[in-house]
Curated annotation (Swiss-Prot):
Organism: Gallus gallus
GO molecular function list: DNA-binding transcription factor activity, RNA polymerase II-specific; RNA polymerase II transcription regulatory region sequence-specific DNA binding
GO cellular component, one term: nucleus
Protein encoded by which gene: HOXC8
Family: Belongs to the Antp homeobox family.
Protein name in the entry: Homeobox protein Hox-C8
Biased composition (Polar residues): 124-136
Motif position, Antp-type hexapeptide: 138-143
Any one biological process term the GO annotation gives: anterior/posterior pattern specification
Localisation: Nucleus
Length: 242
């Protein structure tokens, strides 16, 4: 029984030829990939691959047309992959670090005042920071207050206390208008007068009956006197009828 299957590669490759593809692989050249492992010793030197830069240009400009026309007969790996990685794709024409250094030097040369002004500004800024950090320029409101620290108590003169006592006995609760008048007359603030009256009322409640303030007692006395007078008048009317 005969088979009509024919391998299509037989017509392209002759007997004894390798069937490996001829396209290039940029990892290693063909000679290196097929060779055995190299052993480096103290007496041996590492192989160097040198390739002129004009081959790279030939690969980009003429290699593409030759590869497409010749059917991959020319191996471009021998042209492109044997050179140094830094010189591949024309990297040797871009001096990056030297270009940056030259640009920085030219800017300093063209504008010499900028460097001196920047140095002076930095020194002045450090001086201001040192001055601000000094404790001698700390304002009172910037200093942290100790826990439990209280402000000093207001001391009243004898004349002020006497006038405030008189006002308290007359009326323990001051209106806003009367409070302003008393504060102006005694040379005190409205808040100081208010606090003094609050403390005086608390003291009065502790010393006497809690529900009876001086003004309240006076009102009760007037009410009791009025009730007694009414009772007397009623008794006199009843006696006159009899």
């Amino acid at each position: 029984m005969s088979s009509y299957f024919v391998n299509p590669l037989f017509s392209k490759y002759k007997g004894g030829e390798s069937l490996e593809p001829t396209y290039y692989d940029c990892r290693f050249p063909q000679s290196v990939s097929r060779s055995h492992a190299l052993v480096y010793g103290p007496g041996t030197t590492a192989p160097t691959f040198q390739h002129p830069s004009h081959h790279v240009q030939e690969f980009f400009h003429h290699g593409t047309s030759s590869i497409s026309n010749s059917g991959y007969q020319q191996n471009p790996c021998a042209l492109a992959c044997h050179g140094d990685a830094s010189k591949f794709y024309g990297y040797e024409a871009l001096p990056r670090q030297s270009l940056y250094g030259a640009q920085q030097e030219t800017t300093v040369v063209q504008y010499p005042d900028c460097k001196s002004s920047s140095n002076s500004n930095s020194s002045e800024g450090q001086g201001h920071l040192n001055q601000n950090s000094s404790p001698s320029l700390m304002f009172p409101w910037m200093r942290p207050h100790a826990p439990g620290r209280r402000s000093g108590r207001q001391t009243y003169s004898r004349y002020q206390t006497l006038e405030l006592e008189k006002e308290f006995l007359f009326n323990p609760y001051l209106t806003r208008k009367r409070r302003i008048e008393v504060s102006h007359a005694l040379g005190l603030t409205e808040r100081q007068v208010k606090i003094w009256f609050q403390n005086r009322r608390m003291k009065w409640k502790k010393e006497n009956n809690k529900d009876k303030l001086p003004g309240a007692r006076d009102e009760e006395k007037t009410e009791e006197e009025g009730n007694e007078e009414e009772e007397k008048e009623e008794e006199e009317k009843e006696e006159s009828k009899d």
